[in-house]
Amino acid sequence: MSKLWRRGSTSGAMEAPEPGEALELSLAGAHGHGVHKKKHKKHKKKHKKKHHQEEDAGPTQPSPAKPQLKLKIKLGGQVLGTKSVPTFTVIPEGPRSPSPLMVVDNEEEPMEGVPLEQYRAWLDEDSNLSPSPLRDLSGGLGGQEEEEEQRWLDALEKGELDDNGDLKKEINERLLTARQRALLQKARSQPSPMLPLPVAEGCPPPALTEEMLLKREERARKRRLQAARRAEEHKNQTIERLTKTAATSGRGGRGGARGERRGGRAAAPAPMVRYCSGAQGSTLSFPPGVPAPTAVSQRPSPSGPPPRCSVPGCPHPRRYACSRTGQALCSLQCYRINLQMRLGGPEGPGSPLLAT
């Protein structure tokens, strides 16, 4: 973590800390990790005056010791050990080369000196107080891995691994639907249809009889014939495709290729009958050489004037027939007159209705 040193003035050598100068070592600093930033000097002029006064006055009695420091070691959020260590200064054994790890601390607080060997002894005591829980954690993880590997080996021997070669996971039935739960219970209740095949070790092959040999030769001969037939068909299709392409490019049309396939000439078009209907009338055309059908007999036109109403004296043409007498009538009035005349009624032929 941090080492606090006092930088040499001119020669760059390490000097022993004077009273009022402190050097503090933490656990990580003892191992050489991490460095604090250089602190700002405070009251520089006053400090120089005080320093000269102390040199003139000579050695004085050391001030009472400050409260001890408490070192706490944490790894992974767990406290590994706690040790109370008094603040101290490092007494160098001799002059050394200047180090970049020299930071000036507040020099106004006097500290008592502690040898570095004593501090290392304290660190050793802290390491012996409580064992590191990381060993237990690593041991626990190793035990879990060994247990899982053993379970995997057991499942491999029993053939209980899944398709991916992993251990089969236990299915929580509470997370399944009713249909999935029913299918799972059905699969568990029914025995597996797959049975292990018997492995024949060192068994001689069955002896082949003469009939079996003949059947085998017959099957081989049929396979050879089918292969030759397929090769011949493939060759014919290739020849036909090439011939068709050449005929199409030489004669310039599908008709030429079709005629050449059929007999070397194009087929004549089939005779067609054409029917046209227009405002001037309807026509029916036949190709040459095809006899036309006989003329359709025309419907005779009605001769004579149209029939008139059967009521005497009525000049109107017939519009409908009477449902009772069957006579031609033209209106409702003629219908009534016809009923009176044919069926009898109070009014005779001289009725005034006839005049109208």
From Swiss-Prot:
Keyword flag Hydrolase: no
Zinc finger HIT-type: from-to: 305-336
Keyword entries, A-Z: Coiled coil, DNA damage, DNA recombination, DNA repair, Metal-binding, Nucleus, Phosphoprotein, Transcription, Transcription regulation, Zinc, Zinc-finger
Residue ranges, annotated region (Disordered): 1-71, 124-150, 246-269, 286-310
Subcellular location as annotated: Nucleus; Nucleus, Nucleolus
Sequence positions bearing Phosphoserine: S97, S99, S127, S130, S132
Coiled coil: 213-245
Record keyword Transport present: no
GO cellular component, one term: Ino80 complex
GO MF terms held by the record: zinc ion binding
Any matching Pfam family: zf-HIT
GO BP annotation list: chromatin remodeling; DNA recombination; DNA repair; positive regulation of DNA repair; positive regulation of DNA-templated transcription; positive regulation of telomere maintenance in response to DNA damage; regulation of cell cycle; regulation of chromosome organization
Ranges of biased composition (kind: Basic residues): 33-51
Subunit (UniProt): Component of the chromatin remodeling INO80 complex; specifically part of a complex module associated with the helicase ATP-binding and the helicase C-terminal domain of INO80. Interacts with RP9.
Role played: Induces growth and cell cycle arrests at the G1 phase of the cell cycle. Proposed core component of the chromatin remodeling INO80 complex which is involved in transcriptional regulation, DNA replication and probably DNA repair.
Name recorded for this polypeptide: INO80 complex subunit B
